Amino acid sequence: MAAAYLDPNLNHTPSSSAKTHLGTGMERSPGAMERVLKVFHYFENSSEPTTWASIIRHGDATDVRGIIQKIVDCHKVKNVACYGLRLSHLQSEEVHWLHLDMGVSNVREKFELAHPPEEWKYELRIRYLPKGFLNQFTEDKPTLNFFYQQVKNDYMLEIADQVDQEIALKLGCLEIRRSYGEMRGNALEKKSNYEVLEKDVGLRRFFPKSLLDSVKAKTLRKLIQQTFRQFANLNREESILKFFEILSPVYRFDKECFKCALGSSWIISVELAIGPEEGISYLTDKGANPTHLADFNQVQTIQYSNSEDKDRKGMLQLKIAGAPEPLTVTAPSLTIAENMADLIDGYCRLVNGATQSFIIRPQKEGERALPSIPKLANNEKQGVRSHTVSVSETDDYAEIIDEEDTYTMPSTRDYEIQRERIELGRCIGEGQFGDVHQGIYMSPENPAMAVAIKTCKNCTSDSVREKFLQEALTMRQFDHPHIVKLIGVITENPVWIIMELCTLGELRSFLQVRKFSLDLASLILYAYQLSTALAYLESKRFVHRDIAARNVLVSATDCVKLGDFGLSRYMEDSTYYKASKGKLPIKWMAPESINFRRFTSASDVWMFGVCMWEILMHGVKPFQGVKNNDVIGRIENGERLPMPPNCPPTLYSLMTKCWAYDPSRRPRFTELKAQLSTILEEEKLQQEERMRMESRRQVTVSWDSGGSDEAPPKPSRPGYPSPRSSEGFYPSPQHMVQPNHYQVSGYSGSHGIPAMAGSIYPGQASLLDQTDSWNHRPQEVSAWQPNMEDSGTLDVRGMGQVLPTHLMEERLIRQQQEMEEDQRWLEKEERFLVMKPDVRLSRGSIEREDGGLQGPAGNQHIYQPVGKPDHAAPPKKPPRPGAPHLGSLASLNSPVDSYNEGVKIKPQEISPPPTANLDRSNDKVYENVTGLVKAVIEMSSKIQPAPPEEYVPMVKEVGLALRTLLATVDESLPVLPASTHREIEMAQKLLNSDLAELINKMKLAQQYVMTSLQQEYKKQMLTAAHALAVDAKNLLDVIDQARLKMISQSRPH
């Protein structure tokens, strides 16, 4: 038996080969008898619904039952008895229901004599429904989905333009909900999402033309958004059942009606209704209740024939158990009588669980007779492996083949490998279809080629086998240094795919193992190599659809390759979606892929951005701790993956461009490749400079032996201890080689480092100041810096030499100028600190130089952070123009925060400044302001390590302190001048607003716990609390001013 190709997805791609399409019904092979039948169906796949079809080969003895069986088998249907095959003439709308026992060859011979083959359409449909069919179909998902698609298609073609607008809107929105089950309920509120639905998918797919033409676009959008919200919480199955519930009152899809007459002559004109609930009934007019004639289990035999009158009407006779005579029905034609007979026969077989037909009819010549002995086709001898179309004439099978495989997909013959040449080794991994092994391929060119072998566990099923081989057929089209190469296939069971072996395994595992040995340039190199592979796929108009670090293989430490093309062609297949829903890479997917199952080069760009993030994070998976169902909500709220530690800002900026919500705003892979190449070159240059810098710093040269052209360290001013001595700072190599250090380049000299005679400062002090010196006025240093790169090491022979006089003079003059400049700046800062003007402070001016707040108790500190020295640190000196900013020493000592820890938050020091010189001994307002500030300080100190459930008690304490304060102010208000009341009330309202903002930020921090935004909202909580404390101080100032005004008014003039 020749191979059967079961997947219907591949038969819709236009072919450039010599393929003769014979319309909707048949495909003709030149010079051969018709052996191929195209059957349309409603098994959903990624193509347009009008093209859902399977190509079937048949022999002379193949019957309709065999055709149906082979189609439903590959979709794992349970209720096979519900299916029937309908033949329609496209020009005249003539319909024939083909009985299961009819031979396919006889059917084709009979009908193709009347009309050309291209005018016929074969269609698989569900015709016979059991009682309570919806409950039964929910246990058979393929049948439920098939029936839904069939009914929806009939509704759109027959009555959609006549139904009420509200019903049309509901049914359309239910189809949107069913089609895009991962889409959130408010997704259509976003303009870009609605535009995808409107322009790319098309509203005509969901709503009738009459509705789209009669309603304005803006109004229609609002109606769709409002209606869609009603069904936002339904899943796919619930959407289907709701669709049937709304449609059933206006369209009876569960029964068929025929206009006919009861009796052998036109005596009683009726409408015969046949269905699971009615059985066999008739109606005399539309308003009447149906009259029951018989149940299906009462029917014993069915006969039909032509009437003997000149009109040649159809006669249908049913022998009913217990009836004295047969029930006779006269139909307008023999075709209608045959269709009625087939319907009743199908219901009888379904109800009785029988396979034998209840129809009795005369045996026509040639019908169901034994086939003649066929002649053996020449190309049959080529066997299964050549994938020829012909089959043995004696085969009584219906074999589904894929149209594209038959005519357009490249044959695997050139890639076929003899199994004897493969030596199977140890298992090195697991794939979607089976294990992956290491092995040896003994080829003529290389007798011991190391290869990877993908095996298939369940390839006895033709559909599984073909899907498994699809990856090989895809991979053979590519030839790129960073795409895994296909070596060959073995198509006989057990089926194997042989590929090149990447010895270092998956990239994700490789990154985790080599986390501490891989430098940044290597990580960027991997991203760049992947971008070249994906730009190559983009140029071939190919979409990968599963770009992730786990699907990238490491061939060498400087070479990665894109692999795993197994999902590339089947990702949108609805059966695969349902069967492997848990395996979909939701956290890597673009929003339009999650919402609408749309996969394009733009969605690949999004996934590549996530893959780059994985690489920079050394194999950490995205959205750790977030459920798949919650990912789309976070993306639509604007959340994106945070910048990895040590990631260049330019690279992270490129990632964020890949994560643009609108697909049209994402860069193409050709652009990404060019930009990654530039970033890679920049990083390599910086790495080389850092290595040169490190090699220089490794040699410890004392000042008295020369070798240092650094300025001597400045002594600390009295009263201000050295930051290094106070913090015990001694630079480690990683601190001395910061990425943003000044890079020495562009100077060519021929001598070693000259030495300065005499030891002015200890050698250790010189070493300690190297970091500052290297970052100090680089443009000036480069003017005279001698070359240190003549031989890669220091020339020690010149250590005893004395610095030339002119260079010594230049250095001393420059140092003197710098010292004078520093002295002037420090004096200016000291004068500023001494002045301390007593001004009313706002939110922008409340912070002091040391980060604290001035309070009502003079310089008394209400809160002192742990570990803060008693002395005041000198003010920060602004960097000189052109000098790179290194940051504080604390930032040098603090480790880079991990992905999960986020930004560390330190509580702010709050010390309200002194206000009016009033007696505070019995000042309730002052006491409550101080209490509120203390509550804010306590919350600030506890918020960082606190779990989310402890946020509410802390904020509640602040709220109670504020309530007490406002009550005290209300008590004091009557005694204050009336002219000041409005200002005090405004200050109170501002405090209430501050508390509301604090509560809002607290809710956001709780909502986004365990995400990258949690630390940001904690910071915003502290900011809101700080604003509350500042405004409480301002309220005290307003009341003090009112008191002073009252005192001045009471004094005698």
From Swiss-Prot:
The keyword Chloroplast does not apply. Keywords: Angiogenesis, ATP-binding, Cell junction, Cell membrane, Cell projection, Cytoplasm, Cytoskeleton, Developmental protein, Kinase, Membrane, Nucleotide-binding, Nucleus, Phosphoprotein, Transferase, Tyrosine-protein kinase. Residues 35-355 form the FERM domain. Residues 10-19 have a biased composition (Polar residues). GO terms for molecular function: ATP binding; calcium-dependent cysteine-type endopeptidase activity; identical protein binding; integrin binding; molecular function activator activity; non-membrane spanning protein tyrosine kinase activity; protease binding; protein tyrosine kinase activity. It catalyses: L-tyrosyl-[protein] + ATP = O-phospho-L-tyrosyl-[protein] + ADP + H(+). It is found in: Cell junction, Focal adhesion; Cell membrane; Cytoplasm, Perinuclear region; Cytoplasm, Cell cortex. GO terms for biological process: actin filament organization; angiogenesis involved in wound healing; epidermal growth factor receptor signaling pathway; negative regulation of anoikis; negative regulation of cell-substrate adhesion; negative regulation of protein autophosphorylation; positive regulation of cell migration; positive regulation of cell population proliferation. Interacts with ARHGAP26, GRB7, DCC, PIK3R1, PXN and SRC. Interacts with the ARP2/3 complex. The C-terminal region is the site of focal adhesion targeting (FAT) sequence which mediates the localization of FAK1 to focal adhesions. Belongs to the protein kinase superfamily. Tyr protein kinase family. FAK subfamily. This is Focal adhesion kinase 1. It comes from Gallus gallus. The lineage of its organism: Eukaryota, Metazoa, Chordata, Craniata, Vertebrata.
